[in-house]
């Protein structure tokens, strides 16, 4: 079983590094891992809060990770925050422009996010990308 991890609102890289070292999880913040023909890449943190990234840095982090996925058939993008304009934001939480730009640029098959606890389980499509707020419970799906 492979486990990917990335920081949310309150975790710093020290905490993520500790969990990677202790449990062998894969840090997805700016990195990828591949399983067969599936490539997973991500960006943690949020565009608000203690450890915030600006929109340009969000996109650059996702691009850096995505650029190494040249030999996979399917891509999964994992972020803490939801994309700008998503129904996941309930019209109150604007989401990330950088994440929306990444969806439109890289066209991952699936985008997994969290951040808004109240919309756990909501799914939508942005272009051809299936966007899922997995929340705390998570979601199991197969390709």
Predicted regions and their residues:
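Proline-centered loop/turn at the N-terminus of a beta-strand
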Residues: 1-4, 26, 39, 74-76, ...
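A broad, low-specificity signal for short, low-complexity segments enriched in glycine/proline
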Residues: 1-7, 91-94
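Hydrophobic residues at beta-strand termini and immediately following loops
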Residues: 6, 43, 132-134
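Active-site glycine-centered loops adjacent to acidic/histidine catalytic or metal-binding residues
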Residues: 8-9, 80, 114-115
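Conserved catalytic scaffold of divalent metal-dependent phosphoesterases
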Residues: 11-98
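Binuclear metal-dependent phosphoesterase catalytic core
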Residues: 32-37, 53-57, 100-110, 117-143
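Short Gly/Pro-enriched loop/turn and capping motifs at secondary-structure junctions
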Residues: 82-84, 116-119
